[in-house]
Amino acid sequence: SGPIGRVAANAGVPLVLQEQNSYAGVTNKLLAKKAEKICVAYEGMERFFPKEKIIFTGNPVRKDLLNAVSERAEGIAFYGLNANKKTVLVTGGSLGAGSINKAMVRWLEKIAGWKDVQVIWQCGSYYHKELEEQLKGRMPENVKFMPFLKRMDLAYACADLVVARAGAGTISELCLLGKAVVLVPSPNVAEDHQTKNAMALVNKQAAVMVKDAEVVERLGGVMERLLQDDGERKSLSEHILTLAMKDSDEVIAREILKIM
């Protein structure tokens, strides 16, 4: 986007930026001087951009997620779950997250003993074959193990607790749905922006964060604590829901139309 934005601005074409993360990327910081407006999803972005250009819009999310809260029964049926059990969704994205998968392997025997809990474990296409062979004959009955999620909206709908990376898109979806979440920021991103994304929620009592370097040892204990504490899950859900912005796409579009 850097070269395109620069050429456009130099040619007199109005430039609107969207910064999805709580810590601005290098390209957007360089283009900020030439931009007409800068759409952001987090408070405090005047640290990086001229205050007068900032528009607080949030990040656009998929419209199919808007109905996910009311689709629990459909999700339970789709993923073959028990409606009377609490459900944990563990996801590392389409390719998967190695550290989260290692943590799941580490805690699998413990999870097997959680009789009132079931887990959707989306391991990612990159790790699926290796894990399938490694865990042959060892997968607990209360764990649904899969490389990817065919219906992300229904997986969210089932979940009483989510374990996920802290990418901007994922966080925006979780805010919209009001899901209690354990965020495990990826260390393999520019300027450690996922940790900053996660901390923006933690500081508002809207999420729990486990560092990637600690997730193998800590994840099971954190999950168990939250599953046993309905009050803490409810509090996390209520706080994260206050951060939701449902019409981000429309707000951004209107701002663009104003300068055309």
Regions found by a protein language model. Give the residues of each.
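Active-site-proximal region of nucleotide-activated glycan assembly enzymes
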Residues: A9-A73, L81
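Conserved acidic donor-binding segment of nucleotide-sugar-dependent glycosyltransferases
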Residues: V208-E214, R225-D230
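Short, glycine/polar-rich helix-capping loops at beta-to-alpha or helix-loop-helix junctions
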Residues: A24-T27, A41-F49, E130-L131, T170-I171, ...
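Donor-nucleotide binding loops and adjacent catalytic segments primarily
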Residues: E71-A77, L81-V162, Q194-A198, N203, ...
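C-terminal alpha-helical cap of glycosyltransferases
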Residues: K246-M260
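A short, well-ordered alpha-helix in the C-terminal region of glycosyltransferases
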Residues: A77, E232-K246
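An aromatic- and histidine-rich active-site surface loop
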Residues: S1-A11
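A donor-sugar binding/catalytic signature common to diverse glycosyltransferases
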Residues: M152-Q194
